[in-house]
Curated annotation (Swiss-Prot):
Lineage, broadest ranks: Bacteria, Bacillati, Bacillota, Bacilli, Lactobacillales
Keyword Transmembrane helix included in the entry's annotation: yes
Pathway annotation: Lipid metabolism; phospholipid metabolism
Enzyme Commission code: 2.3.1.n4
Gene name tied to this protein: plsC
Name assigned to this protein: 1-acyl-sn-glycerol-3-phosphate acyltransferase
Organism for this UniProt entry: Streptococcus pneumoniae (strain ATCC BAA-255 / R6)
CDD domains in UniProt: LPLAT_AGPAT-like
Cellular component aspect of the GO annotation: membrane
Keyword entries, A-Z: Acyltransferase, Lipid biosynthesis, Lipid metabolism, Membrane, Phospholipid biosynthesis, Phospholipid metabolism, Transferase, Transmembrane, Transmembrane helix
GO molecular function: 1-acylglycerol-3-phosphate O-acyltransferase activity
């Protein structure tokens, strides 16, 4: 069912599952780490404003921390098409707003779809301007989408464990939000305009990383906290198993792409 909210569309089925799955993954991360800290969240735009949330892509789990810190706002995000080959995982990320991108042969829909969603729905967009976890170069996709959708760019950085072992050993996680970037002053989004936006984003990433150093340390919480988190971890695992079973069945019934076509 599609509901209209402030003249923008919301897909209720996707919204409910998005909220549930975000909560489940956050519970799992809290159970195995429980040492996350969020800074400058007052800079996040209000819920009525759509924006592009951008960050350097450093781990598999930084998108979850980004989505949790900005709740109840919900997002769409780009994902390489290979992630959609698994029936259950592919259905999960589609229900949570992911849309496939062919990195070898990108199509016009890679730009058109997020622009339409930012304009027509109440969802914002998560992007990693570097494109992958193995690159630090800011590319121009976020600039083009922000300009055409007439939205601001919201930078955030993740500082924390880069491996699953570090996450489980409860190394500190810091999410630091920067100043929203307004690009309305850039009249033409040509090569020069794209480079200007990329430089603004990269400069803010560097500033945030430097600022985070004052909070980030190697101190780990008291290991006795595991006695509290073990029951939560067991609960999260049980819920995850039930969710996998439900998702497998639901993937034959509910097609997220069908409703998404109505939205876009």
């Amino acid at each position: 069912m599609i509901r209209y909210n402030n003249n923008k569309k919301t897909i209720e089925g996707d919204r409910m599952f998005y909220t549930y799955l975000r909560g489940l993954v956050v519970l799992l991360l809290w159970s195995i780490n429980g040492n996350a800290h969020y800074h400058n969240t007052d800079k996040i735009p209000n819920q009525d404003e759509n924006y592009i949330l951008v960050a350097p892509h450093r781990t598999w789990w930084d998108p979850v921390y980004m989505a949790f810190a900005t709740k109840p706002k919900q997002f769409i995000f780009m994902a390489k098409k290979e992630l959609f080959t698994n029936r259950i995982f592919g259905w999960w990320i589609r229900m949570c707003g992911a849309f496939p991108i062919d990195r070898e042969n990108p199509s016009a829909s890679a730009i058109k779809y997020p622009i339409n969603v930012l304009k027509k729905s109440d969802r914002s967009l998560i992007m990693f301007p570097s494109g992958s976890r193995h690159s630090n170069d800011v590319k121009g996709g976020a600039a083009l989408i922000a300009k055409m959708a007439k939205v601001r760019i919201m930078p955030v950085t993740y500082t924390g464990p880069m491996t699953l072992k570090g996450l489980i050993s409860r190394e500190r996680v810091d999410m630091n939000f920067g100043n929203p970037i307004d690009i309305s002053d850039i009249k033409k989004m040509n090569d020069e305009g794209i480079e200007t936006v990329a430089n603004r984003i990269q400069t803010e990433f560097q500033r945030l990383d430097e600022e985070t150093k004052q909070w980030h340390n190697d101190k780990k919480p008291n290991p006795l906290w595991w006695f509290i988190r073990i029951p939560a971890l067991i609960l999260a695992i049980i819920l995850a198993i039930l969710t996998i079973i439900f998702s497998f069945i639901a993937s034959f019934i509910w097609n997220p792409d069908k409703k998404r076509e109505e939205l876009a």
